[in-house]
């Protein structure tokens, strides 16, 4: 085996298999086939070996080629002095099994970068600590009630906070690049799309009425997959199908029971407070993680190939969405995060990959891994936040290939905890930045669709939403 290193995260491997090994595989394959071979003019298994070899030559050679590749790749993985993070890249059809001589083939494979582990012990860290106020609970409770508000079509001009049913058309020059079907949005100051932002959406749409057609601009993200269009403004036309005014429900005993069998408003407020505390803990963990990573990255410099970064984008976003879900953030918050991340994906993914490689290397050295019970705990927590069953959550994660992302999430959190325990930590009370009501609303629509656009699993559930108060969409799915 010959290994060359064209890049810090890439290896080119040439594998050479001796002729004797090829002949042994061929002999074993024919030994297995001859007793069962069906050749015209002979009973099954009675045809001469030479005739069997002639008739089944192509099939056996292809089978042997596959077996040799699988077995040799397994041995390469076992013996190699690198840690693979991807599958071997080669063209199976172009590899030929020679009639004589050695069997050689070549492949490339992405590997973990090699670097010296930063000194992570005895760091000095500041831990921001939030306090949840009654005003915070009031605001969160209003957001919960807003999701169960009755909506009535209105001829009155739209105001910030109203709901709009709109369609959209996006044009670059003379070319229509996408059209948006009917979307129900909250009229906010800014509209976030999957790959673009309309910064003055509130100003554009305020005072609009049913049937109005409003034109403006949206700006594509600086990290858009189409490099020529990064940061470019395109024309947007929004058509108002309907203006809807909301009427919040009253906290009657019947409504409290419908929400989640709460007996009093105080019980509901405690539920909402617990959700806010989980979100505050998440922000604290993220701030601590950011401080730790900043210190570790300062002494660990390594290159990342652009192809690796592009391939890891969706995987990294999946991992972060899982973190948001388990921490109780609602659907709109997650959608805003997803849109912002997509718009600046390249830079964010590079930073996250560096974090991952450093934390993974520390995990290897400290023998840290995810235990079966930890998977169950995470799945149980996600299930509780989404008012779903652990079995259904696990099935969804397995179906969408996110179990590996869950494993990374568990391992990286354990490493951060290890580093924090070894650090000198000073707590600092902080005030949560006030989130202006109706500042931004996010929708899942790509203004400029790309060929490689993997859908991010929608976060359909909201931790602030008490059990029993599922959306109609989820109730219908549960009936299936």
Curated annotation (Swiss-Prot):
Q: What name goes with this protein?
A: Trigger factor
Q: What is known of its domains?
A: Consists of 3 domains; the N-terminus binds the ribosome, the middle domain has PPIase activity, while the C-terminus has intrinsic chaperone activity on its own.
Q: Where is this protein found?
A: Cytoplasm
Q: Which domain of life is it from?
A: Bacteria
Q: Which InterPro entries match?
A: PPIase_dom_sf, Trig_fac, Trigger_fac_C, Trigger_fac_C_sf, Trigger_fac_ribosome-bd_bac, Trigger_fac_ribosome-bd_sf, Trigger_fact/SurA_dom_sf
GO CC terms? cytoplasm
**Compositionally skewed regions (Basic and acidic residues) per UniProt:** 429-480
The family note in this entry says:
Belongs to the FKBP-type PPIase family. Tig subfamily.
Q: Which residues form the PPIase FKBP-type domain?
A: 161-249
Q: Where is this region: Disordered?
A: 426-480
A Pfam family that this protein carries is: Trigger_C
Q: Which GO terms describe its biological process?
A: 'de novo' cotranslational protein folding; cell division; chaperone-mediated protein folding; protein transport; protein unfolding
Please classify the protein's predominant subcellular localization into one broad category: cytoplasm
Report a single Gene Ontology molecular function: protein folding chaperone
Q: Which reaction does it catalyse?
A: [protein]-peptidylproline (omega=180) = [protein]-peptidylproline (omega=0)
Query: What does the UniProt keyword field contain?
Result: Cell cycle, Cell division, Chaperone, Cytoplasm, Isomerase, Rotamase
The species this protein belongs to is Rhodopirellula baltica (strain DSM 10527 / NCIMB 13988 / SH1)
The record's top EC class is isomerase
Enzyme Commission no:
5.2.1.8
Q: What does this protein do?
A: Involved in protein export. Acts as a chaperone by maintaining the newly synthesized protein in an open conformation. Functions as a peptidyl-prolyl cis-trans isomerase.
């Amino acid at each position: 085996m010959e290994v060359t290193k064209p890049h810090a995260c890439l290896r080119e491997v040439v594998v050479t298999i001796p002729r004797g090994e090829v002949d042994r595989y061929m002999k074993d394959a024919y030994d297995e086939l001859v007793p069962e071979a069906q050749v015209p003019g002979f009973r099954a298994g009675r045809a001469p070996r030479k005739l069997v070899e002639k008739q089944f030559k192509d099939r056996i050679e292809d089978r042997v080629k596959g077996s040799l590749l699988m077995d040799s790749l397994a041995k390469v993985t076992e013996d190699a002095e690198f840690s693979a993070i991807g599958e071997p890249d080669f063209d199976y059809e172009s590899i030929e099994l020679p009639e004589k001589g050695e069997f050689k083939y070549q492949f490339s494979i992405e590997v973990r970068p090699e670097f010296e582990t930063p000194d992570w012990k005895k760091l000095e860290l500041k831990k921001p600590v939030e306090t949840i106020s009654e005003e915070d609970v009031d605001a969160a409770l209003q957001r919960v009630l807003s999701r169960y508000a009755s909506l009535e079509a209105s001829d009155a001009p739209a105001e910030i906070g109203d709901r709009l049913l709109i369609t959209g058309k996006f044009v670059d020059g003379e070319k229509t690049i996408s059209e948006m079907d009917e979307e129900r949005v909250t009229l906010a100051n800014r509209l976030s799309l999957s790959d673009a932002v309309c910064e003055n959406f509130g100003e554009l749409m305020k005072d609009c009425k049913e049937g109005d057609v409003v034109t403006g601009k949206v700006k594509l993200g600086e990290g858009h997959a189409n490099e020529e269009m990064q940061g470019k403004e395109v024309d947007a036309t929004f058509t108002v199908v309907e203006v809807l005014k909301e009427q919040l429900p009253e906290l009657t005993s019947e409504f409290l029971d419908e929400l989640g069998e709460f007996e009093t408003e105080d019980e509901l407020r405690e539920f909402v407070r617990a959700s806010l505390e989980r979100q505050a803990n998440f922000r604290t963990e993220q701030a601590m993680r950011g401080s730790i990573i900043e210190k570790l990255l300062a002494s660990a410099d390594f290159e990342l190939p652009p192809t690796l970064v592009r391939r890891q984008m969706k995987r990294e976003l999946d991992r972060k969405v899982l973190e948001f879900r388990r921490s109780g953030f609602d659907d709109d918050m997650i959608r805003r995060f997803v849109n912002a991340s997509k718009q600046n994906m390249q830079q964010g993914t590079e930073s996250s990959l560096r974090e991952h490689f450093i934390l993974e290397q520390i995990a290897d050295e400290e023998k840290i891994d995810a235990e079966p019970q930890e998977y169950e705990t995470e799945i149980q927590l996600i299930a509780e936040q989404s008012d779903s069953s652990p079995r259904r959550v696990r099935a969804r994660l397995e179906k969408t290939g996110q179990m590996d992302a869950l494993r990374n999430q568990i391992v990286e959190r354990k490493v951060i905890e290890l580093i924090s325990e070894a650090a000198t930590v000073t707590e600092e009370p902080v005030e949560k930045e006030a989130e202006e009501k109706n500042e931004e609303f996010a929708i899942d629509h790509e203004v400029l669709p790309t060929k490689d656009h993997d859908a991010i699993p929608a976060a359909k559930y909201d931790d602030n939403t008490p059990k029993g108060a599922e959306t109609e969409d989820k109730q219908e799915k549960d009936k299936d």
